[in-house]
Amino acid sequence: MLPAVGSADEEEDPAEEDCPELVPMETTQSEEEEKSGLGAKIPVTIITGYLGAGKTTLLNYILTEQHSKRVAVILNEFGEGSALEKSLAVSQGGELYEEWLELRNGCLCCSVKDNGLRAIENLMQKKGKFDYILLETTGLADPGAVASMFWVDAELGSDIYLDGIITIVDSKYGLKHLAEEKPDGLINEATRQVALADAILINKTDLVPEEDVKKLRATIRSINGLGQILETQRSRVDLSNVLDLHAFDSLSGISLQKKLQHVPGTQPHLDQSIVTITFEVPGNAKEEHLNMFIQNLLWEKNVRNKDNHCMEVIRLKGLVSIKDKSQQVIVQGVHELYDLEETPVSWKDDTERTNRLVLLGRNLDKDILKQLFIATVTETEKQWTTHFKEDQVCT
């Protein structure tokens, strides 16, 4: 496990290092309902944040609240001396799963090594015993890389879906972590975790002055203009704000439409160049041109701003109108992956079709990005070469 960042007093409490103490939950699910659930996709929520921020406390809280969910917990790595390491091998169906621990209420804990795919695939062999997965990452993990694996593996995608990314920020050390400078101009881990989040929990607010919480909140909002920000103590939060968000699927289309109308553009704080930009362009987009627009941002990484700095998109989200399609289409991009999916919402005949996009990233220029997007809508390609060229790929 990677070492904690910061001083010794940032270490996790002992309770933070151990697997959550789980209590038995009554279930009234019938055998028929359980069988029918075997074919249903299971949501996965990624919980991320620096060591000591309160990730395991949140897990503990979720698992001991009354919500009638049967939850499987995936721990990215077991901490040294963790109580889990005392009993990692369990017998299931005559086979030995060395990395799995089945707890007394039927919930599961496991250690995810390498890219985590094998562990999750093994977990899916136990499908029917749980209906929700919580995945806790290490403190320095990039949640974008973790989220990407749910899109890359088609077989895995038939069993599960990514529901949302929750980032927990320590009220006392959050500003310090967000301001940390990395070599070669890289984005630090804390900033990337905040930028990718669907919900950000500012935790331990009772341990710092209110003014410090306000500064931290403003900094977080400057990085992520779309995610919900919640202030918590001991990671206690209304579970409807962190579970069943449907942040990455077509069911989020209706709520996303309202949310995108009120997303503010942001300015960088703490000398960071991470911002949220949003724009709207009326009309229809040709799907192949829209793919070209997104691929140049996420794959080719050859789009530059007015200062000739590379634009780096960390997360992309929006609702678009695709030519010859009656349904609104949601676009999602994380890391170097993206997806277009039709929503259940149709465009009304008496309303103007439009495209709303929100991009979170570094060195983003709203005017240039909007200009490039307009090229996909108007189907004119003369503007495309203005700010990206094949011989100017960002490295």
UniProtKB/Swiss-Prot annotation:
Family matches, as InterPro entries: CobW-likC_sf, CobW-like_C, CobW/HypB/UreG_nucleotide-bd, P-loop_NTPase, Zinc-reg_GTPase_activator
Zinc in keyword set: yes
Residue ranges of domain CobW C-terminal in the record: 274-377
SUPFAM superfamilies for the chain: Hypothetical protein YjiA, C-terminal domain (SSF90002), P-loop containing nucleoside triphosphate hydrolases (SSF52540)
Any one cellular-component term (Gene Ontology): nucleus
Annotated residues for binding of Zn(2+): C107, C109, C110
Reaction equation(s) it catalyzes: GTP + H2O = GDP + phosphate + H(+)
Record field: compositional bias (Acidic residues): 8-20
Renumbered ranges of motif CXCC motif: 107-110
Major location category of this protein: nucleus
Enzyme class at the top of the EC tree: hydrolase
Motif annotated as psi-PxLVp motif, chain positions: 17-24
Stored CDD domains: CobW-like (cd03112)
Name recorded for this polypeptide: Zinc-regulated GTPase metalloprotein activator 1B
Organism: Homo sapiens (Human)
